[in-house]
């Protein structure tokens, strides 16, 4: 069997930054460092940070007063920020700057009293944090996941409306939903550029090319990773078998029935180290050659917070 690697794949700038923030906080301040929610959605990464002294919690009530806490790359609501401030917690914010950009759009709509529609997945921490930027009772923010949800929206055609999206959605599904929104609400406003981030876009486009050449696409990523799930779904939509995995032990022999070419990609929160471990495991199942596709070069970089950056330089 032949392995073809998608390019780009794996870590994005926001994930790199978030992991660096936890690592530097541990190095400078020592354990324990509390992290609200998994800093990124990858079991391999989270377990590694936990072994170094990071304590992952779902609510700030689990964090002692005055302790150091890191907000995950997915972002948090204004209520969570206020709670941290009220409890005198030392906060390092690992929210991806591209998520923060969407937060600013929602906050602007809230200040103006413009009703906002967020396209995203219910229950995802990014969605919860984004919706939590809206506080104006005279307006409101409403979540939709798909075209069918639009019919249940309470707004009128002539209402002052704006929309935003989660950063890790399917490009195709989101384009369809936005088109349907604009059809029902012709005057609706939206971002000048799609809120779906560069890494999500690039990895989905790379999977389109990968799927054309593969009998099976393996997506390295955890089950709670939105962008990783979208990659597996996209390959399946293109008529190619796909599997999502985040451990070499997940691999099953029957995946390779009638498979000559295995395509491999990785979600934005999956490390290259894990990809290479999976490749090593695949060699035991008969994979004997590796090819890497040409792809877009990503040079995006996000700085860590100033307090950590100064220590890093010194």
Swiss-Prot record:
Residues annotated as catalytic: 126
Enzyme class: oxidoreductase
Residues that hold dimethylallyl diphosphate according to the record: 41, 74, 124, 225-227, 269
Residue positions binding [4Fe-4S] cluster: 12, 96, 197
Reaction catalysis annotation: isopentenyl diphosphate + 2 oxidized [2Fe-2S]-[ferredoxin] + H2O = (2E)-4-hydroxy-3-methylbut-2-enyl diphosphate + 2 reduced [2Fe-2S]-[ferredoxin] + 2 H(+); dimethylallyl diphosphate + 2 oxidized [2Fe-2S]-[ferredoxin] + H2O = (2E)-4-hydroxy-3-methylbut-2-enyl diphosphate + 2 reduced [2Fe-2S]-[ferredoxin] + 2 H(+)
Binding site for isopentenyl diphosphate: 41, 74, 124, 225-227, 269
Cofactor field: [4Fe-4S] cluster
Gene3D superfamilies found in the cross-reference section: 3.40.50.11270, 4-hydroxy-3-methylbut-2-enyl diphosphate reductase, catalytic domain (3.40.1010.20)
InterPro entries with a match to the protein in the record: LytB/IspH
UniProt keywords, alphabetically: 4Fe-4S, Iron, Iron-sulfur, Isoprene biosynthesis, Metal-binding, Oxidoreductase
Biological process terms in GO annotation: dimethylallyl diphosphate biosynthetic process; isopentenyl diphosphate biosynthetic process, methylerythritol 4-phosphate pathway; terpenoid biosynthetic process
Keyword Metal-binding part of the UniProt annotation: yes
Cofactor remark: Binds 1 [4Fe-4S] cluster per subunit.
EC number(s) reported in the record: 1.17.7.4
Protein's pathway: Isoprenoid biosynthesis; dimethylallyl diphosphate biosynthesis; dimethylallyl diphosphate from (2E)-4-hydroxy-3-methylbutenyl diphosphate: step 1/1; Isoprenoid biosynthesis; isopentenyl diphosphate biosynthesis via DXP pathway; isopentenyl diphosphate from 1-deoxy-D-xylulose 5-phosphate: step 6/6
A GO MF label: metal ion binding
Family listed: Belongs to the IspH family.
Function according to Swiss-Prot or TrEMBL: Catalyzes the conversion of 1-hydroxy-2-methyl-2-(E)-butenyl 4-diphosphate (HMBPP) into a mixture of isopentenyl diphosphate (IPP) and dimethylallyl diphosphate (DMAPP). Acts in the terminal step of the DOXP/MEP pathway for isoprenoid precursor biosynthesis.
Protein name from the UniProt record: 4-hydroxy-3-methylbut-2-enyl diphosphate reductase
Organism: Haemophilus influenzae (strain PittEE)
Lineage: Bacteria, Pseudomonadati, Pseudomonadota, Gammaproteobacteria, Pasteurellales
